Structures are given as structure tokens and as C-alpha cells.
UniProtKB/Swiss-Prot annotation:
Species in which this protein is naturally found: Saccharomyces cerevisiae (strain ATCC 204508 / S288c)
Chief location of this protein within or outside the cell: membrane
Residues in Glutaredoxin domain copies: 157-272
Record carries keyword Protein biosynthesis: no
Recorded name of the encoding gene: PRM4
Membrane topology: Single-pass membrane protein
Gene Ontology cellular-component annotations: fungal-type vacuole; membrane
Domain of life assignment: Eukaryota
Name under which the protein is recorded: Pheromone-regulated membrane protein 4
TM ranges: 20-38
Record keywords: Membrane, Transmembrane, Transmembrane helix
Cellular location(s): Membrane
Gene3D superfamilies xref list: Glutaredoxin
Length: 284
């Protein structure tokens, strides 16, 4: 009887332990189920409200942008400042080149150069402009004008030589004077001259007065004591030598009336000119 009682107590203790373990496992399972269910509900709630998530993302982006914006502005300001310095340096070099050229062409004491600079802000692409003004005094201008006039001043000697080179036979006339017209017609009507006679009208020449004065003073075989006013055109040159030195009557008209003008012209031709008498038909 006593043995049966001890066995019964032992069996009852085992059942109690089994129940406790089973209950513990059940509670643990329920707790795990509730935990998994809560996580799924939280993820569904977050996915069901995208506007709020988007708003939060935008706020975070704005915070990051505000944080980085000062650094970007500082970098842009530094870049534009460097570009301003480069532009200003280029303009300064160009102005130096212009001033050096002005100093070469114009005497320094007679010129004044002022430079004005105006710059725009970096918002308008950092445009830097330069204005250079050069002022010349009247004395400098007159000297420059006189220099140009002297450079283009008429040289009668050079002009005379250029005309003589056009032909071995050259006749200088004045179309308003009878002696000039008479000699021109005489040579063209009665004489064959080759190369062709070159005729220069001093009244139509742009510097006829200076050219005639040079001929009278330097190219005629006359007495140096003779007055230049008494010498009149025409002036005939064969091979650069003057034929008329004592006047039209003594050097042209008298020899022509005696039949001596052709030999006179041939003697001055010296083989460089062909001078022949033309066959003039008689009136009979």
C-alpha cells in the first residue's frame, strides 16, 4: 500500500512538469506570433502613406542643399573673381600695346592719353571695357601735316627726268601762246620723227609753273645774266639737250626759212632719233 502511494506521487509530479513546459511553449508561440504581426502592420502603414515619406525626403534634401549651398557660392565667387583678374590683365596688356604704338608715331610731349575703365558685375559675364582717348595739340597736328606735305612735295627735277624718259624727242608748250602752236604744227606737218614726239602742255600740267621755272634755270644753254622773264616757251629737247636756247626766231624760224632746220635736228638726233622731211604736195 505504501509502495503504491509513492508511485502515485511520482507520476503526479511528472504530469505537473509536463503541463508547465507545455504552457510555457504555448505562451512563447503566442508572443512570437504577436511580434511578427506587429512588424507586418508597421511596414504596411509606411507603404500606405507615400506623401509623408516624400515630404520627409524633401526636407532632408533641403537640409543637405542648405548645408552645401554656401560652399557652392563661395566656389563660384572665387572662380568669377579669378576670371575678372584675367580679363583685366588682358585689357591692360592691350592698352599698353596701344600706348607703345602711339608713343612711336607721335612725340610724347605733344600728346596726352587718358584711359577709362568700366566693369560690370559677374552677373553680366564679367564684361570689362576700356576706352582710350588720345588728344593732340595744334602744334603736333601742324607738324604732322607739314611732314606729309613735305613727303608729297613736287620735285621738278624728278618730274622732268620722268618726262624725258618717255621719248628722245620732247616738246614743252603753252597752248595759249602762238610760238608754241606754230612749232608744234611745224614739226607734226613737215617732219617725220621716230620715236614719236612727246608733247607736254605746261598750262595743263598740275605743276607747270614750277616745271617751267626749273627748265629755264637748269636746262637751257643761255647766258646766266639773261632775265628769266624774257625766255618764253616752247622748249624742244632731243636726247635731253635743249634745241631752242636763243629764242624761236634765231633757233627755229631763220634756219627753217634757209632750209637748215632738218640738218640741225639730225645733228641733235645722234642716231637715237629718225628725223626726215615729209613730202608735202605742192599747190600747183
Amino acid at each position: 500500500m505504501i509502495a503504491d502511494s509513492s508511485v502515485l506521487k511520482k507520476h503526479t509530479a511528472i504530469k505537473r512538469s509536463t503541463r508547465i513546459i507545455s504552457l510555457t511553449l504555448v505562451l512563447l508561440g503566442v508572443f512570437s506570433f504577436l511580434l511578427l504581426t506587429w512588424n507586418d502592420s508597421l511596414e504596411f502603414y509606411n507603404s500606405a502613406d507615400p506623401s509623408e515619406n516624400k515630404k520627409n525626403s524633401e526636407e532632408e534634401s533641403e537640409k543637405k542643399f542648405v548645408y552645401k549651398l554656401p560652399n557652392l557660392l563661395k566656389t563660384a565667387d572665387s572662380f568669377l573673381s579669378n576670371e575678372n583678374e584675367l580679363n583685366f590683365q588682358k585689357v591692360k596688356e592691350e592698352i599698353s600695346n596701344i600706348q607703345s604704338e602711339v608713343e612711336v608715331d607721335i612725340p610724347e610731349p605733344s600728346s596726352k592719353a587718358t584711359s577709362k575703365f568700366s566693369s560690370r558685375s559677374f552677373q553680366t559675364d564679367n564684361v570689362v571695357t576700356a576706352t582710350t582717348t588720345t588728344t593732340l595739340n595744334p602744334r603736333s597736328s601742324s607738324l604732322a601735316l607739314q611732314k606729309n606735305c613735305d613727303h608729297k612735295k613736287f620735285d621738278p627735277r624728278t618730274d622732268f627726268l620722268d618726262i624725258i624718259r618717255t621719248s628722245p624727242a620732247v616738246l614743252f608748250i603753252k597752248s595759249s601762246q602762238a610760238d608754241s602752236i606754230f612749232l608744234k604744227n611745224l614739226l607734226q606737218r613737215e617732219f617725220e620723227i621716230s620715236p614719236e614726239l612727246a608733247t607736254v602742255d605746261l598750262e595743263k600740267h598740275s605743276h607747270g609753273y614750277e616745271l617751267e621755272k626749273y627748265i629755264k634755270q637748269n636746262k637751257l644753254n643761255i647766258d646766266t645774266s639773261a632775265a628769266l622773264e624774257s625766255i618764253q616757251s616752247p622748249y624742244l629737247f632731243l636726247n635731253g639737250i635743249s634745241v631752242i636756247n636763243r629764242g624761236m626766231v634765231r633757233d627755229i624760224i631763220e634756219p627753217h626759212s634757209k632750209g637748215l632746220l632738218l640738218p640741225l635736228l639730225k645733228s641733235e638726233a645722234r642716231g637715237n632719233l629718225l628725223v626726215e622731211k615729209k613730202d608735202i604736195p605742192s599747190n600747183s
